[in-house]
From Swiss-Prot:
Protein name listed in UniProt: 1-(5-phosphoribosyl)-5-[(5-phosphoribosylamino)methylideneamino] imidazole-4-carboxamide isomerase
Record field: catalytic activity: 1-(5-phospho-beta-D-ribosyl)-5-[(5-phospho-beta-D-ribosylamino)methylideneamino]imidazole-4-carboxamide = 5-[(5-phospho-1-deoxy-D-ribulos-1-ylimino)methylamino]-1-(5-phospho-beta-D-ribosyl)imidazole-4-carboxamide
Organism this protein belongs to: Buchnera aphidicola subsp. Acyrthosiphon pisum (strain APS) (Acyrthosiphon pisum symbiotic bacterium)
Gene name as annotated: hisA
Cellular compartment(s): Cytoplasm
Keyword annotations from UniProtKB, A to Z: Amino-acid biosynthesis, Cytoplasm, Histidine biosynthesis, Isomerase
NCBIfam families: 1-(5-phosphoribosyl)-5-[(5-phosphoribosylamino)methylideneamino]imidazole-4-carboxamide isomerase
Pfam short name (any one): His_biosynth
Family, per entry: Belongs to the HisA/HisF family.
Gene Ontology BP annotations: L-histidine biosynthetic process; L-tryptophan biosynthetic process
Enzyme class, first EC level, given as a word: isomerase
Length: 246
C-alpha cells in the first residue's frame, strides 16, 4: 500500500535533508485537510514523524497527535524518539494504530522484545535506518542517523523474529529526502530473505516508475513524503500505480 508521510516540527510539516535539523524545508499544507483527502483516496494509514520528540523527549507533540486522532478518520503510525513504555502506551491509548521504534532497537533490545510481546506485533513497527557499504554490508544507524552501530540489518531482524516481528520500516539513509530513487537491490534482498515480514520501503521515491519497481521487490508498503508534498505525482496516481502492479 501507499503510506503518505508527514515530518512534524511544532505542528508544521517540514522535510529534513539527510536528517539534518539545520537543513529543513517548510511546506504550507493543512495537515488535517490532507489526512481527510488521503482517506477519501483510499489511503489506509499515514506515517507521522515527531521531529520535536525525536530531538528532545520533553517536547513530544502529544496534543497534536491527540487532535489528529480525534478529528480525522485515517489511521496513523507515529515515530520519532519513542524510547519508553510510557511513550508507547500514551500514543496507543490516544488511538494511534502503530508506534515506530527506532534507536531503542539497538540500545535496548530486550525491552523492545518485551514491547513486541506485550503490545503485539501489529502495534509495533521497527524502523531500521541502514547504511549499505561497498561490500553490501547493511549497518544500522541510530539517533537520527548521527551514530553508526556495529549491528547488521539481517541480525537485528533475526533477533526479533521469535517475538513475532511483523512490521519493519527500512530506510536506506543515503536516499532519504533526496528524490534520487530507492535502493531496489536492498529491498529485493531483504524481502526474499524474510518473506513473513511486512517491509515498508522508505527513502528516495521520486516517480511513479519507482513505485512500480518497488512493488516488484516484494515490499508491502511504500512511504512517500517529499514527492507528494512537492507534487511530483498525485496521491491518486500513486495509489493507481500500486494497485495496477498487484
Amino acid at each position: 500500500m501507499i503510506i503518505p508521510a508527514f515530518d512534524l516540527i511544532n505542528g508544521r510539516t517540514v522535510r529534513l535533508y539527510q536528517g539534518d535539523y539545520s537543513n529543513q524545508k517548510n511546506y504550507n499544507v493543512n495537515l488535517f485537510n490532507s489526512l481527510e483527502v488521503y482517506k477519501s483516496k483510499g489511503i489506509e494509514i499515514v506515517h507521522l514523524v515527531d521531529l520535536d520528540g525525536a530531538k528532545n523527549s520533553a517536547n513530544r507533540q502529544i496534543e497534536l497527535f491527540k487532535k489528529i486522532v480525534s478529528h480525522t478518520t485515517v489511521p496513523v503510525q507515529v515515530g520519532g524518539g519513542i524510547r519508553t513504555t510510557k511513550d508507547i502506551s500514551t500514543l496507543l491509548d490516544l488511538g494511534v494504530k502503530r508506534v515506530v521504534i527506532g534507536s531503542s532497537i539497538v540500545s535496548n533490545k530486550k525491552q523492545v522484545k518485551q514491547w513486541l510481546n506485550f503490545y503485539g506485533p501489529d502495534a509495533i513497527v521497527l524502523a531500521l535506518d541502514v547504511h549499505v557499504d561497498g561490500s553490501n554490508k547493511k549497518e544500522i544507524s541510530i539517533d537520527g542517523w548521527q551514530k553508526k552501530t556495529n549491528f547488521i540489518l539481517e541480525e537485528i531482524i533475526e533477533y526479533f523474529l521469535s517475538s513475532g516481528l511483523k512490521h519493519v520500516l527500512c530506510t536506506d539513509i543515503s536516499r532519504d529526502g533526496t528524490l534520487l530513487g530507492p535502493n531496489f537491490k536492498l529491498y529485493k534482498e531483504i524481502c526474499s530473505n524474510f518473506k513473513n515480514i511486512n517491509f515498508q520501503a522508505s527513502g528516495g521515491v521520486a516517480s511513479l516508475q519507482d513505485i512500480i519497481f518497488l512493488k516488484k521487490t516484494g515490499v508491502k508498503s511504500i512511504i512517500i513524503g517529499r514527492s507528494l508534498l512537492e507534487k511530483k505525482f498525485t496521491i491518486e496516481e500513486a495509489v493507481k500505480c500500486w494497485q495496477r502492479e498487484s
